[in-house]
Amino acid sequence: MLCLPVFIILLLLASPAAPKSFETKVQSDLTRTDGNMETEENLGEVRKVYCCLGVRDDWCCAGQIQI
């Protein structure tokens, strides 16, 4: 008699309609944030830092490549 309510509760917890756990929500938020950071503006800034500060390439800093 007690097994049926326990089984139903476990079934509800394992169902896809159950709310997401905290870790899953954080992981999806971080994934969404990473996707939003890869805009052309942000990638252009990374290219500028790499070319002008990291490599010190005059050709790159002079704007010969499209940033």
Curated annotation (Swiss-Prot):
<dbReference type="Pfam" id="PF16981">
    <property type="entry name" value="Chi-conotoxin"/>
</dbReference>
<feature type="signal peptide">
    <location>
        <begin position="1"/>
        <end position="19"/>
    </location>
</feature>
<keyword id="KW-0800">Toxin</keyword>
<dbReference type="InterPro" id="IPR031565">
    <property type="entry name" value="T-conotoxin"/>
</dbReference>
<dbReference type="GO" id="GO:0005576">
    <property type="term" value="C:extracellular region"/>
</dbReference>
<comment type="similarity">
    <text>Belongs to the conotoxin T superfamily.</text>
</comment>
<keyword id="KW-0964">Secreted</keyword>
<keyword id="KW-0165">Cleavage on pair of basic residues</keyword>
<keyword id="KW-1015">Disulfide bond</keyword>
<feature type="propeptide">
    <location>
        <begin position="20"/>
        <end position="46"/>
    </location>
</feature>
<keyword id="KW-0732">Signal</keyword>
<protein>
    <recommendedName>
        <fullName>Conotoxin Lt5.9</fullName>
    </recommendedName>
</protein>
<dbReference type="GO" id="GO:0090729">
    <property type="term" value="F:toxin activity"/>
</dbReference>
